[in-house]
């Protein structure tokens, strides 16, 4: 495939994105050869539309979207908002990529706008983030669970979700069917004690 424009450098692309988004970009950072753009929830849809349509950006494809839970980030030293939605965007025509991040403004009820109307590939990705993290995507036309079982309680990728879950499944001989019941396994520490010690291996 021949591109109409040669790929620009990462720093040049970062400057272009910062110029296009203006005040809608809370930060534009470059690390490990990748650009990460963070926007406020109120500017999420407008910023996403600009990244898709603006000359020099043209990110026509959303490759991936996932949720993140920062509640235990940096060993509990992180004091920002808990839930984040991170997307990876690709410009096929300009051969360039960017990561777009937005934090949910309310930790107790995480909500951001759906970008399904901008990139329809976001449909199942947003359902997955809703299922696993409990992030609500306002404007999504079919926000149902997609991976967990019917009647599943909670959101299993949240840092405070118990490793044993809330219910277990077993075959009941009397009823001659599979049933669900509260878990009978007691939670226990699965990390070897030596690794849990402070400053193990010089780690801070």
From Swiss-Prot:
One of its GO terms (molecular function) is NADH:ubiquinone reductase (non-electrogenic) activity. SUPFAM superfamilies: Nqo5-like. Keywords: Cell inner membrane, Cell membrane, Membrane, NAD, Quinone, Translocase, Transport, Ubiquinone. It is a peripheral membrane protein. It catalyses: a quinone + NADH + 5 H(+)(in) = a quinol + NAD(+) + 4 H(+)(out). Its EC number is 7.1.1.-. GO terms for cellular component: plasma membrane. InterPro entries: NADH_DH_suC (IPR010218), NADH_quin_OxRdtase_su_C/D-like (IPR037232), NADH_UbQ_OxRdtase_30kDa_su (IPR001268), NADH_UbQ_OxRdtase_CS (IPR020396). It is an enzyme of class 7 (translocase). Belongs to the complex I 30 kDa subunit family. NDH-1 is composed of 14 different subunits. Subunits NuoB, C, D, E, F, and G constitute the peripheral sector of the complex. This is NADH-quinone oxidoreductase subunit C. It comes from Polaromonas naphthalenivorans (strain CJ2). The lineage of its organism: Bacteria, Pseudomonadati, Pseudomonadota, Betaproteobacteria, Burkholderiales.
């Amino acid at each position: 495939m021949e591109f109409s424009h040669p790929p620009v450098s990462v720093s040049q692309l970062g400057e272009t994105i910062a110029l296009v988004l203006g005040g809608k970009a809370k930060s534009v950072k470059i690390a490990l050869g990748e650009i990460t753009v963070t926007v406020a929830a109120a500017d999420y849809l407008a910023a996403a539309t600009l990244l898709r349509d603006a000359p020099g950006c043209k990110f026509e494809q959303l490759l991936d979207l996932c949720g993140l839970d920062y509640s235990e980030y940096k060993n509990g030293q992180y004091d920002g908002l808990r839930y984040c939605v991170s997307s990876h965007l690709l410009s096929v025509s300009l051969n360039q990529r960017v990561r777009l991040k937005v934090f949910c403004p309310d930790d107790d009820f995480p909500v951001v706008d759906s970008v399904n109307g901008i990139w329809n590939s976001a449909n199942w990705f947003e359902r997955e983030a809703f299922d696993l993290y409990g992030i609500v995507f306002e404007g999504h036309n079919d926000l149902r669970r997609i991976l967990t079982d019917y009647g599943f309680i909670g959101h299993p990728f949240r840092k405070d979700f118990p490793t044993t879950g809330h219910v277990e499944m077993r075959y009941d001989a009397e009823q001659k069917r599979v049933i669900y019941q509260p878990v009978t396994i007691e939670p226990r520490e699965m990390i070897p004690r030596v690794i849990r010690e402070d400053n193990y291996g010089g780690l801070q």
